[in-house]
Amino acid sequence: DAEAIIKKAKGDNDLLVAYLHWGSEYRAKPDESSVAMAEWLIDQGIDVVIGGHPHWSQGASTYKGKPILWSLGNFIFDQDWSEETRYGLAASFELVENEVRAIELYPIRIDVSQPRLLEGEAKRLRLEELAKRSDADLADGVRSGRILVK
């Protein structure tokens, strides 16, 4: 079962990341089942939860001090019929003693199935939108493109 697999993986590894294909499509916030699953995974020992599938970038949260990126959105995709589906997010994680201390956010825009990093005002506006979708205590970090994890 999943609980036993996570427990074994936790014993064999310094950091566990769960990357899930989950959630309801075309929504700015995670659905209740995604929230419940993320919390359950962290309760079992997962250190970082990252989601995908909704085709929209969703915000960031923490649960018991562990980071959750609800959905990175699209990266290389051809859903150009919707403005929101033409955005995605890449992230990097700064580790200190096997714990996530910071997350760098790299918003992208997809043009003809090609991801391109946003810069300047476009980047600022996208991070502002993601901040609105994030937990209030993380909003300033999301706006800056660097979330500090406590």
Predicted segments with their positions:
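Acidic, metal/ion-coordinating pockets
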Residues: 1-150
